[in-house]
């Protein structure tokens, strides 16, 4: 990958120096197409979401364990180049009177290097890590996971922590409408979200985990990032007049997808 980047930079310099040449202009056009393709390929990423529920009285112990042990293992995998990033989030909108706390782990992975990480022996002893894992399992009441493919959006730089809050909208979409739905989100709603100063990040993710023929399961997740909970309230509170064009745009997206559920999450830990 480093070799590819060096070649990429060298060609850019040569094209800049010779930009007045007609032949080089033609070559530049071809190269720009290559650059766009290269940039798109570099964005390909899987995001695995791991939902873990513990009793409310065990929530802080669970956070402490993640901070002391497992976040360091993920950081090691990131430094080794076998993982892109890892975040731990807390579900902020559970059911009323819920006696449990749900955490959501986001594993940012390279599709071509999926699950290709191990280690930890040089950080912790085998017995210490084994005990931490055992206690981790004892606290967990239930868990589940889903794998998603990042389709596009705008997010913080790879070496930056994400904003403090995220809203995950789980979308039900007919397989017949997958392509049109993706294009509508990426070409129409992505620019709108990017122009909204309250929204600090936005991403479209397609669920790639098998759904066991469940026609009521969500097919996509739209993630919207914010700096604070008041910013989320402010966004939800906005009621603006719509032009005929905007009404038609929203009617189109509403015909393509249905929101199954929404999760509001707050950031607990992050490793990059």
Model feature map: region roles:
Residues 41-126, 134-272:
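Short S/T/G/P-rich N-terminal loop/turn motif that feeds into the first structured element of a domain
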Residues 22-26, 130, 254, 258:
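Short alpha-helical segments used as structural interaction elements across diverse proteins
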Residues 1-44:
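Bacterial Sec-dependent N-terminal signal peptides
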């Amino acid at each position: 990958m480093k070799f590819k980047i060096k070649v990429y930079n060298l060609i850019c310099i040569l094209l800049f120096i010779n930009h007045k040449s007609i032949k080089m202009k033609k070559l530049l056009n071809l190269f720009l197409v290559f650059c766009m393709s290269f940039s798109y390929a570099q964005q390909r990423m899987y995001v695995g979401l791991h939902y873990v529920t513990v009793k409310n009285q065990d929530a802080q112990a669970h956070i402490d364990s993640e901070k002391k042990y497992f976040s360091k293992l993920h950081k090691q995998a990131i430094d080794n180049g076998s993982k892109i990033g890892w975040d731990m989030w807390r579900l902020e909108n559970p059911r009323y009177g819920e006696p449990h706390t749900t955490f959501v782990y986001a594993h940012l992975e390279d599709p071509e290097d999926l699950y290709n990480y191990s280690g930890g022996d040089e950080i912790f002893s085998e017995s210490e890590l084994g005990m931490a894992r055992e206690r981790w399992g004892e606290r967990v009441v239930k868990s589940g996971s889903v794998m998603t493919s990042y389709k596009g959006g705008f997010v913080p730089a790879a070496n930056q922590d994400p904003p403090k809050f995220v809203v995950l909208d789980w979308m039900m979409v007919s397989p017949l409408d997958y392509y049109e739905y993706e294009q509508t989100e990426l070409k129409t709603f992505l620019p709108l979200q990017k122009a909204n100063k309250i929204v600090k990040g936005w991403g479209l993710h397609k669920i790639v985990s098998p759904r066991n023929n469940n026609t009521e399961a969500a097919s996509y997740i739209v993630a919207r990032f914010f700096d604070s909970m008041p910013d989320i309230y402010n966004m939800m509170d906005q009621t603006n007049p719509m032009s005929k064009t905007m009404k038609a745009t929203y009617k189109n997206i509403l015909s393509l997808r249905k929101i199954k559920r929404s999760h509001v999450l707050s950031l607990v830990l992050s490793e990059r």
